Amino acid sequence: MEVSPAIARYFEELEGELDAAIRLAAAARARGLDPRTEIEIPVASDLADRVEALLGYKGIAARIRELEAEMSREEAALRIGDDFAARKFGETTPEEILDHAIRAAMALLTEGVVAAPTEGIGKVSLGKNDDGTDYLKIYYAGPIRSAGGTAQALSVLVGDYVRQALGINRYIPRPEEVERYIEEIRQYNNIMSLQYLPSEKELRMIIENCPVCIDGEPTEQQEVSGYRNLERVETNTVRGGMALVVAEGLALKAPKVLKNVRKMKMEGWDWIEEMIGGGPKSDDDDASAAIKPKDKYIRDLIGGRPVFSYPMRKGGFRLRLGRARNTGFAAAGFNPATLHILGDFLAVGTQMKVERPGKAAGVVPVDSIQGPTVKLRSGEVRRVDDAAEARRLAGQVDEILDVGEMLVSFGEFMENNHPLMPPAYCEEWWMLEGGPRHPENELEAIEFALDGVPLHPDYTYMWDDVAPADIARLAEAVGTGGTVEDGVLMIRNTPETKAILEELLIPHHLSGDRLAIREHLAFLACLGLTLQLTKRPAWQDAPMENSLDLVMHLSGFTVRSRAGTRIGGRMGRPGKSKPREMRPPPHSLFPIGDEGGARRSFQAACSSKPRSNTDGGVIEAEVGERQCPACGAFTYKNLCECGAHTNPVFRCPRCGKDVGQDVCPRCNAETVCLQKVTINVKAEYLAAMESLGVRESSVALLKGVKGLISRERPVEPIEKGILRALQNLYVFKDGTVRYDMIDLPLTHFRPDEVGVPIERLRELGYTHDTYGRELVSDDQVLELRHQDILVSEGCGEWLVRVAKFVDDLLVRLYGLEPFYKAEKPLDLVGHLLMGLAPHTSAGVLVRLIGFSKAPVGYGHPFFHAAKRRNCFAGDTEITVSDGRRWMSLPIRQFVTENFDISKPGLDHVGTFYSDPRQPFYVRSIDSQGKTSLKRVTSVSVHRAPAHLVRFATRRGRVLTVTPDHAMLVWDTDYLRKIKALEVAVGDRVPVEEGGLVVADEVVSRETVQALDDRVYCLTVAENHTLVANGIFCGQCDGDEDCVMLLLDGLINFSRAYLPETRGGTMDAPLVLTTRIDPSEVDKESHNVDVCDHYPIEVYNGCLAYAHPKDLDAFVDRVERRLGTPAQCEGFLFTHQTSNISAGPLESTYTRLGSMLDKLEAELDLAKRIRAVDEDDVAERVLNTHFIRDLQGNLNAFSKQKVRCMKCNAKYRRMPLAGKCTRCGGHVIPTVHEGSVKKYLEMSRNICATYAISDYTKQRVEVLFMQIESTFGEPPEKQLGLADFM
């Protein structure tokens, strides 16, 4: 990796600190108190090794390193095809050669992402041309989208490269096949909205000339209407993968394809150059027409999360092009005043669903862009740019006329393949058009305009928001009824005049019965009025077709659109920042059994009822069997009484012999490390307290776990749990403690906003600011090193407690010297942490550099990009569709019948899987509770752990899953994913009743023995959820990103603690990446802008709706710096922000408790925002949330089962005896009246208050009548005397 000397020193410092920590951790581990005597987190391998491990092609890693040393990665991905063609990696058939070469190239191009090379390519085969020759067919699947356009296109090129080497002919399409492609790709665009839709001419050119047949699996439910039942096209269903590769791959990435064709001197691709150079160019109007309002982000609207702007509506977010030091990488900037005026719903770190350019954006504060314009109750119209002023005026706002600007970088358009759009006219654009300096006043701005420079944006109003006729009426009103008094323009206050001024966003206030405008000179000029308020001659031939043209004609100025493009948005997921805890949270991984009670308490176990011939506190537990190699004694502890470290013993569960292998050679049974022992918990607990020198009264509650579920079942020393309890810390499944935070990008910071003295920062290498000046002041801007992070202040306090715990551990348990000696968060600045994200099981080494007041984690885009699957019991019933019919069957049967044994795969957590033999679909659910059909992209088989988790719900649903399986629970009004072990009795899970989604309460959760040696799973596209035994749950997913103290991970993490199941190793630091190579991280970070301004060509391109790739040469992005020393430093930004923690720190959504309060706040805000239709919001909430819940719960009530409170037995109907026939316990319903009526009154109130359609009102009233007939009229409340006083 090419880096500067400064970055090289930075890496050396990090690795020096890491080496010191490793030496200390190794000394602690050598004491023998842990399952292993060595550290269990190795350093991560490079990209080449990841590709080899992912695909299993032995020897490919070394060849990749050789190629990458000589050429670019894209060229290496093509050249590797020569080795496959030469059969260097063991392939035999042409199909196998082609398949492996294409997958290897895909893995290389996507940095080893699983979905692209495995799930994105269905299969590779050969077809027959009409002349009898063979041709190559690549079947693409839906997950190919994750590979990106470049990798998609180059996979076709790799296929052709190897095809030629093998002597296979090109694909010769039939005319009807060409027409089928054109129709199908257009139809797919109507379903899924392609980011780039090629013209018919481009599509025809690609299909007729591409030497490879781009085929695909059916991914959608729709079928094509024409060109059906073609001989060489296997399905009539729309093929999404094919459409993506043709449109967003070959068409969109044609220049990159051509570049590699020329490098490799490949034949048969000349047509690419013709398509690039001779393709039809759309004019401005055509491009503009393509940018239409998109309401997808508000289709699944739910109660409590407000809409801030409807699609492209006046008053909505105005696009501002640029990047601040805390935006980019899917984060958008908003003025803090906007965040406050919008009711504090958008706190720093809140996710917002947006209309474009992507689907979502993280909210961050940028105070150098414009805030909202509001109308106060006094009638005054004022723009608010200051957060303090916004907080002061919040209670006086009558209407939010404009919500302000939204800062979006050029790179976001590039990343999302979205055409550029005209931004709001701003000062940086004005300067590029000749503006000499910021005008001191209005008069100077007019002077600049008279000199030929466009009118300054501060004095440009929203002229294109009003019609030319409105401008004419306003000019008439000002000319006939206006006067200038003491430098203030006074206009007669009429409803029409006031409304037009409000649409123009002209600041004004009421003075008696007149409207007062202080800065009015530019306003009068644009109205074509003189200073004496008389009409200028320009009115005689004024053009009345376009408002901006009219204003420019009347004033003689060049006037730009101040509105630019409006972007819609609504609130998404609220932020989160808190310690990671299992449910219930334990202090120690010590099995306490049922004797610990519901809280798994050591104190309860110690005082449990004495057994015969014991003093009490004695339990029986299933733990791992271990043997001392020195004295031969058998125990459950990691350290023998003789002082030697013990080893796990794996016995055959049938013959009981220690065979020293994973499988018994005699019984062919898998060996287990398991024994049932009697433990005197009280004696062990008191001995641990004494050895630590801790008084028993110091620990009010010490919590263990009910049982152990790993393969080895090692028992963690009680001492560790005691020391955690002293610091109020809870252990995670792998022995570590960790803290979850929402990630936000940051490339620069100031000392005064991170709470660290400049002296300490200088010690850490921050000696100069971004502009090369020596660091002497705490308001200088410093460039963040890409492995330095900021954590929230809450996380800082938590880290201090962890540091004290680790020091206590080193001193009291391991007999070593303390390491951190921290008393306050500042003491930990400069220390190393480990960042961990889901889906990779890889930690990233980072250094703590400061603290954020906002409850988020700020890190470099490279850090976030560097961090980027759980199973069912075999008899779990799932419902699947093959596109023709629905069928219900056990998951074991479905997986085994559809596992393609000829092409099994092995993913990064060691799970075998394959694509299903044919396309299947399941019902899937998103976080808002909306269901849809999604394709099954793979099936998998896993070795079962010893124990599973079984849930039962009030409605009689029962589901058995592995302990780490991703479950869905309702968090007020959205679905949150947690692990099965964290699900608690009382949690509400989504279930399917009569085709509807309703909430069902978990009434029991127990750990059960696995009766089968295998568990099974599906991978589902997009939402990664499905229905199992009637319960919506996850499949293969992760959790939030988190951080942990480095030494805690090095000392306490052990693979031996991890659950023995697929997913058990997820979210665990199996490897540690010590150096982040920008070229190997997620490519989204490569689209981060690193320039300090955009040239005029970019703004002109925005006016022409150009594609960002056409302007790539004008914008300095990370991608252009890869492979040079500048790839890690020298980044700049276009917009300043004074405080990265400005604005609300907690969302109103989180602060409000009940749904009623949240709904009232949502609708009240909708009433006040001009860009929002409150009646439509109310109706959408009814249709997509409340009515669906009411109907589903009512249906469930009528079909419910009854349950025994004692033994949890379920009955379809009440037993005739009126009690449980098994145990005689009391039998109760599983669905209660309150859950059915929950949203009824709220729904009726909405219908009475808002303009709801008659149809929706009638639906609510029908539900009301059905509920009333079911439960009867509510009883009248007995009133007392106090009720009348």
Curated annotation (Swiss-Prot):
SMART domains: HintC, HintN
Sequence similarity: Belongs to the archaeal DNA polymerase II family.
Gene name, Swiss-Prot/TrEMBL: polC
Source taxon at top rank: Archaea
One of the GO biological process terms: DNA catabolic process
Coiled coil: none
Residues covered by region (Disordered): 565-586
Name of protein: DNA polymerase II large subunit
Catalytic reaction annotation: DNA(n) + a 2'-deoxyribonucleoside 5'-triphosphate = DNA(n+1) + diphosphate; Exonucleolytic cleavage in the 3'- to 5'-direction to yield nucleoside 5'-phosphates
NCBIfam families listed in its UniProt record: intein_Cterm, intein_Nterm, polC, PRK14714.1
Organism in which the protein naturally occurs: Methanoculleus marisnigri (strain ATCC 35101 / DSM 1498 / JR1)
Taxon lineage: Archaea, Methanobacteriati, Methanobacteriota, Stenosarchaea group, Methanomicrobia
